[in-house]
Amino acid sequence: KSSLFFAKILLFGEYGIIEDSKGLSIPYNFFKGALKIPETPSEKSKNSNSILFDFCNHLKQIKGLADLDLILFEKHLNEGLYFDSSIPKGYGVGSSGALVAAVYDKYSNNKITVLENLTREKLLKLKTIFSKMESFFHGKSSGLDPLNSYLSIPILIKSKNDINVTGIPSQKSNGSGAVFLLDSGQTGSTAPMVSIFMEKMKSDGFRKMISSQFIKHTNSCVDSFLSGDIKSLFANTKKLSKIVFENFKPMIPDEFHQLWKKGIDSGSYFLKLCGSGGGGYILGFAPDIEKAKNDLKDYNLEVVYHF
């Protein structure tokens, strides 16, 4: 039986980790996927199977990398193998990451497993393998999404070459504060959004804002979340939400600009990008989730973590 691989949420670090900020990524068990061979092929399984065939050809180009048994992979593909997944594509919750993790898990001959002592070297090795594998899906990948899905534990990124598995404060089921996902109702695409960011990074003003403000507040958010300092977390999330609103407009779907600003002005909720933006989910932080739910009653809200 194939293992299940979960979605992920990058709580903090979108765009920042490209420029060496801290980041914090957590598994999200609400969505999941597994490799399967269908009894009778469907439209869905055929589409997935054809993507996996292309993916297999990509893996042949980098085959020295992960010691993958591509002959077995191809045999299964000819039997109709597909990735049966509930993870929405283009939503910033790691649909391609889970697929990459599943393929590595099933076909790597000498895989690094969750059960062994995960040294920093092993984590970086996995991340490198995953980054090359996932580049098939969106050009440039940090390897973090598959890593998160594969290990299914929170990951703290301290810098590009310093990643650790981490514990996060346990949830308070009766807490009034919460992290939630807001459904934008449209899909986003990673590659064009990252290109816009890279283009903007060529301007001195934007670069300066990233290093002096964006990264600073991202790092403070990670620190205050992990230490359980909720007051500081909301203060920094508010600053981050404002910086994103002022400098990352193309990544925020047009019809959410007003809503984004309303949250900052009222203090009821603070929105931020979930992954690369441009659609998919928008991440929200609310000091009082009931009030936020009321203010956002026309939207689909999914609470993912209670403070």
Indicate residue ranges for each PLM-predicted region:
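Stable alpha-helical structural segments in soluble proteins, enriched in small hydrophobic residues
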Residues: 98-110
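Gly/Ser-rich catalytic serine loop of serine hydrolases
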Residues: 86-98
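Glycine-rich beta-strand-to-loop/alpha-helix junction loops that act as flexible
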Residues: 94-96, 274-279
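C-terminal nucleotide
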Residues: 2-12, 16-18, 25-27, 33-78, ...
